[in-house]
Swiss-Prot record:
Compartment(s): Secreted
Residues carrying Lysine amide: 113
Region of interest called Disordered, as start-end residue ranges on this chain: 82-114
9 X 8 AA approximate tandem repeats of [AP]-[ILS]-[AP]-A-A-N-A-[DE]: region residues: 22-93
Name of this protein: As-peptide 126
Low complexity composition bias: residue spans: 82-96
Taxonomic superkingdom: Eukaryota
Native species: Anoplius samariensis
Keywords: Amidation, Pyrrolidone carboxylic acid, Repeat, Secreted, Signal
Taxonomic placement: Eukaryota, Metazoa, Ecdysozoa, Arthropoda, Hexapoda
């Protein structure tokens, strides 16, 4: 045997013993497993995000609207009515009768007999 062949076989034996060299079948299996895990993770995360966001939005908006509307309506309606009616009454009542300023400026006319 030639010296180069013996060195090559010795090097190959050392690599196999140390575990650095693996057969092509073992390499292919490891690559397939690594690719499958990476593909599953890469596909699962975007799918989970794509499904979760529309569901969260679809559930949150009607709940928020259903909870907010009655509260806002319950608070706004009495306040509007409570504020509008006294203001309207306060504005309408003084203008219904004679102005106190007009009465103070125009003293009553007194006719003298004689």
């Amino acid at each position: 045997m030639s010296r180069a062949l013996i060195c090559s076989l010795a090097l190959l034996a050392m690599l196999v013993i140390s575990g650095t060299y693996a057969s092509p079948a073992a390499n292919a299996e490891a690559l397939a497993a690594a690719n499958a895990e990476a593909s599953a993770a890469a596909n699962a995360e975007p799918l989970a995000a794509a499904n979760a966001e529309p569901l969260a939005a679809a559930n949150a908006e009607p709940l928020a609207a259903a909870n907010a509307d009655p509260i806002a309506a319950a608070n706004a309606e009495p306040s509007a009515a409570a504020n509008a009616e006294p203001l309207a009454a306060a504005n309408a009542e003084p203008s219904a009768g004679p102005s106190p300023l007009a009465a103070a400026q125009d003293p009553p006319v007194v006719k003298m007999k004689g």
